[in-house]
Amino acid sequence: MTDEKVNSDQNMNGKQGVNLISSLPTTQVPVSILTNKERRKSIHDESNFERSDSHEDQSKSNSNRRNIYKNDYSTNLRDFSFANLKQNSERNKDGHEIQINTSMPANTNGQQKRFSPSLPSAVSFTVPEVERLPYHRYSISNKPGKQQQQQEQLQQNQQQEEQQKAQLQEQNQRAKQQEEVKQIQEQVQKKQTERQQLIDEKERIANAIFKENTTNDGTDIRKHSVSSGTSNSEDEVDSPSMEKNSIVHMPGDFIYFNPKSNASKPITAKAAPLSANNSTHKNKEVITAPTGPRVPFTEFFQKEDDKKFHILIGATGSVATIKVPLIIDKLFKIYGPEKISIQLIVTKPAEHFLKGLKMSTHVKIWREEDAWVFDAVNKNDTSLSLNLILHHELRKWADIFLIAPLSANTLAKLANGICNNLLTSVMRDWSPLTPVLIAPAMNTFMYINPMTKKHLTSLVQDYPFIQVLKPVEKVLICGDIGMGGMREWTDIVEIVRRRINEIRKARDEETGDKEQEQEEQEGADNEDDDDEDDEEDEEDEEEEEALNETASDESNDEEDEEDEEDVKTEV
């Protein structure tokens, strides 16, 4: 009875072994089945571990299990079924074979022990060292645990903190920018109010001065109302009382704007406060529309040898053009009209800013229309042997060329070689032996434009005789504060004065060298004359000596003859 039961158990185990072989992968791995004694020992160990505390027991049992099954990569049969092994074998395509030893261990007598399928058994898989992975797919270390979750939580917290810090920094930067903008706006408003107060004060002073001048001159300007019935009556308007006479506050102030005319009430010539006759400044006149040349054109270019320094000034379309009369007046104060001569070239936009300003009568103003008038003079004047071209004559006449202010439009024209007006034509025809000074003046955003930098760089590189007087940072006419305003006119005058002194010094050295050469040449000529005189003197002396010798010989002969005669008489 026992033998039949053992045989049936063996047959059953054999069938299970065959099914296991057919279902497992074909990798040849030695497999051994643990005995019941070993299994009971492991179960006993696990039961001992379960008696400890829940957390400590769990960690220790996990570590024990890892120590038991990690070295030989073993697993418990109760953790998986043969059906799972079969599914895994179908998925595995490596072609390995697994051999399972299902024979029962033998006793010392040679009899096999009975195998009980009800008891849990373990299968050990032994993998070669080459095919071992760093971590088995059933290893506990690969499974996500609390430590990994804590790390992810820490990373999320760090990211949130960084985002909060970045937001705080952005808010602080915005607040600083807003404060800076407010400060700049306050400064601009303060300067505008100061400027307005200064202008009002100057207007008040100008009106008071005008009233004093009108009372001293005995001018009596009255107002007449226009009657509706008479059409031939004319109105005389007292312009100072009706309009404000604005004044520009500058050092050496002598510039006044023409009062604004009322469209409905024209101003008579008597009421004009800026006429040449009523002006308190001598040798100055108001700039008006061109009325043709005051003197023939040739008068300005036949004086190249007048022993004066010739300064040519160009003004372009910038509001800084109103400072040109200040520059001219200061140069005349330094040198005087006897030592320098100044001529001014203005463009069409520059005329708009110069209109109504007072200019010295020693200055000749050239406009764009004068070039065509110059051609008419060439046609009418038959005495000229050659046709004179205005921009050629200006280039020959000038010893230095100052363009102040230089607008962005004219700067672009000069950089690209455009010559569509008198000023640009003179510059295109300029000689590299004569220095040129340019003072740019424009809005801040026009000055920081990349094209402005490109134009200035090309001018300096292509024309080494050009010196750029860089603009300064100031409150512009539009109210903005920034770089782009023309250099201070006093600085421009000082730079021009230095260049004039340098040119004069170089000329004096050249003239000194020429005079020294002439003196040396004259000395050499004098030495030659002295040598010739010495030779003539020597010849004269020789002739005198010869004559003296002949005379002495003749006297001696006469004395001898007289002696002989005396001897004969005695005998």
Curated annotation (Swiss-Prot):
Changing C478S: Abolishes PPCDC activity. SUPFAM superfamilies: Homo-oligomeric flavin-containing Cys decarboxylases, HFCD. Residues 8-35, 60-72 have a biased composition (Polar residues). Its main location: cytoplasm. Residues 516-571 have a biased composition (Acidic residues). Keywords: Coenzyme A biosynthesis, Cytoplasm, Phosphoprotein. GO terms for biological process: coenzyme A biosynthetic process. Residues 146-171 have a biased composition (Low complexity). The modification Phosphoserine is found at S42, S116, S121, S124, S264. Residues 43-59 have a biased composition (Basic and acidic residues). One of its GO terms (cellular component) is cytoplasm. It is found in: Cytoplasm. Residues 1-72, 100-120, 140-171, 209-244, 507-571 are annotated as: Disordered. GO terms for molecular function: catalytic activity; FMN binding; identical protein binding. Transmembrane segments: none annotated. Component of the phosphopantothenoylcysteine decarboxylase (PPCDC) complex, a heterotrimer composed of CAB3, HAL3 and VHS3. Present with 2940 molecules/cell in log phase SD medium. Component of the phosphopantothenoylcysteine decarboxylase (PPCDC) involved in the coenzyme A synthesis. Belongs to the HFCD (homooligomeric flavin containing Cys decarboxylase) superfamily. This is Coenzyme A biosynthesis protein 3. The lineage of its organism: Eukaryota, Fungi, Dikarya, Ascomycota, Saccharomycotina.
